[in-house]
Amino acid sequence: MNMQNFHYHFLKTNNELTLIADDLRSIFDSTLEKVISLTEEVETDIVVRHSPINSIPELGSSGQYTKDARCIDVYLDLDSPHLKSNFETEIARTLIHEYMHVVREQYVPWENGTLLDSLIAEGLTQSFEIEVQPTLPPSIYA
């Protein structure tokens, strides 16, 4: 697989991600390999930052996609006990979920979507999470 279409950016303002950057790259590479085998490859920037305020407290992580820039933002709370004990699972789950939004956006652009549109989009991403990780339930925080 050609991983040149995925650009990882680890924000280093306070060096919080320095010690885990290689682990994150490894998780991203293995997760994207599975994802691409089930869908298509869309050039995407993946930006990771330590941001407790943007993380879901129960997970220690969260993510979002930026449709026009084909960018995924991954927010981590590196002090979260849940994230520390479920690091690979939560990172992979976030990437799978947000990447599916990026792929969907290529075919069904989001413009002034309704609540129904949001429910459908989140349902599709959760179904994809199950397809990629069949032994794990999808996140309840879609």
What are these regions (language model features)?
Residues D77-T94:
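Short pre-active-site segment immediately N-terminal to the catalytic Zn-binding motif
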Residues L115-A142:
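Post-HExxH zinc-binding segment in Zn-dependent metallohydrolases
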Residues D68, Y75-L76, V103, V132:
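Hydrophobic, aromatic-lined core segments that form the binding pocket/scaffold
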Residues H9-R70:
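Auxiliary, metal-adjacent structural segments of Zn-dependent hydrolase domains
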Residues V108-E111:
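Membrane-interface helix caps and helix-loop-helix hairpins in membrane proteins
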Residues R93-Q106:
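Active-site recognition of the HExxH zinc-binding catalytic motif
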